[in-house]
């Protein structure tokens, strides 16, 4: 009994759209083709479309199968747990191995054959997704094992002082007599000198150079200046009565220990030994300016009653200021005339 659903083709046969042809009809098509019947005659005899007959016969000639479905079926899985295990072993032995080298080793060791060996892209994906995290975790664990233990930093309290390389280096620094020693808890750490530091540019010796110096004493550092008071400096002279001299002596005593290469304050001239500046001559702002001080500046209609032709506003001009240029010119002309005679 034929099914109730289906469609009828041009030849009068019944087929179901989207469903494969039954296996019995497929087998009959192959048998008629082996008897030498043409595909067009098979199509009319079995009432099956010509395209369906041609497709079934072509697939049978290529694969030898009359079953429906994709030719060859789905590809079997190649990334089995055994293959992944061997890939992980190869990667751990040689972290710099490439994917194509792993593929060759899988074939050489007999883990896979040429039909089920994974491709280079599949091996790269396995290394990235499944083995990459494990390799990074292993490197991190090995780094933590070989990492040295952290050294203790500066103690948080000067009462509970713990031994550290910084305090040991600070203990080797000699302390001159008369200067209190610096506690180890606040000692400055030793730093490597830099060629571009301020101390090298200015030519100031660093603390490390002072420690390596053979002399038993070293120049005072910044920490030692805080411990020095005014009692350590010599007092002023008793005969100093003037306040200015007393201040100058205090500055000389205070800055007497200047570093090498810098002049001391005592080498400069004191303010008391300098002569006062001369008082400038008072000149009226209404003075007439001319190209040269000469007698051609005659009287004017607006000349002052008590003034002179050279000073119409009754302002006195010193002779040395007014006629200095004229006198020099006159002396020069007399010397030229005498030499000509």
Curated annotation (Swiss-Prot):
Its main location: nucleus. One of its GO terms (molecular function) is RNA polymerase II cis-regulatory region sequence-specific DNA binding. Keywords: Developmental protein, DNA-binding, Nucleus, Paired box, Transcription, Transcription regulation. SUPFAM superfamilies: Homeodomain-like. It comes from the Eukaryota. Residues 168-189 are annotated as: Interaction with KDM5B. It holds the Pfam family PAX. PROSITE patterns: PAIRED_1 (PS00034), PAIRED_2 (PS51057). It is found in: Nucleus. InterPro entries: Homeodomain-like_sf, PAIRED_DNA-bd_dom, Paired_dom, PAX_fam, WH-like_DNA-bd_sf. Residues 7-63 are annotated as: PAI subdomain. Residues 82-130 are annotated as: RED subdomain. Residues 4-130 bind DNA. GO terms for cellular component: nucleus. Interacts with KDM5B. Transcription factor required for normal development of thymus, parathyroid glands, ultimobranchial bodies, teeth, skeletal elements of skull and larynx as well as distal limbs. This is Paired box protein Pax-9. The lineage of its organism: Eukaryota, Metazoa, Chordata, Craniata, Vertebrata. The gene is PAX9.
């Amino acid at each position: 009994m034929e099914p109730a659903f289906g469609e009828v083709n041009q030849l009068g046969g019944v087929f179901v759209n989207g469903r494969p042809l039954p296996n019995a009809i497929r087998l009959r098509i192959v048998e008629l083709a082996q008897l030498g019947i043409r595909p067009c005659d098979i199509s009319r005899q079995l009432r099956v479309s010509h395209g369906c007959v041609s497709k079934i016969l072509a697939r049978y000639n290529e694969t030898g199968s009359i079953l429906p479905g994709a030719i060859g079926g789905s590809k079997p899985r190649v990334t089995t747990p055994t293959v992944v295990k061997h890939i992980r072993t190869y990667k751990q032995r040689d972290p710099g191995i490439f994917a194509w080298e792993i593929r060759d080793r899988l074939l050489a060791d007999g883990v896979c054959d040429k039909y089920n060996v994974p491709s280079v892209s599949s091996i790269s994906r396995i290394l990235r997704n499944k083995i990459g995290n494990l390799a990074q975790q292993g490197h991190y664990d090995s780094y933590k094992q070989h990492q040295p233990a952290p050294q203790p930093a500066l103690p948080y309290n000067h009462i509970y002082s713990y031994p550290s390389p910084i305090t040991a280096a600070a203990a080797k620094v000699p302390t001159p007599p008369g200067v209190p020693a610096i506690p180890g808890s606040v000692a400055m750490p030793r730093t490597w000198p830099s060629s571009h530091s301020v101390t090298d540019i200015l030519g100031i010796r660093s603390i490390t150079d002072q420690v390596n110096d053979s002399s038993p004493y070293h120049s005072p550092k910044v920490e030692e200046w805080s411990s020095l008071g005014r009692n350590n400096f010599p007092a002023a002279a008793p005969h100093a009565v003037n306040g200015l001299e007393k201040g100058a002596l205090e500055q000389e005593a205070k800055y007497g220990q200047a570093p090498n290469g810098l002049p001391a304050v005592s080498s400069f001239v004191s303010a008391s030994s300098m002569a006062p500046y001369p008082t400038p001559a008072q000149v009226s702002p209404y003075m007439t300016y001319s190209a040269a001080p000469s007698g051609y500046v005659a009287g004017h209609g607006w000349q002052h009653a008590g003034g002179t032709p050279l000073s119409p506003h009754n302002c006195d001009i010193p002779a040395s200021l007014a006629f200095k240029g004229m006198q020099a010119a006159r002396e020069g002309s007399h010397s030229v005339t005498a030499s000509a005679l």
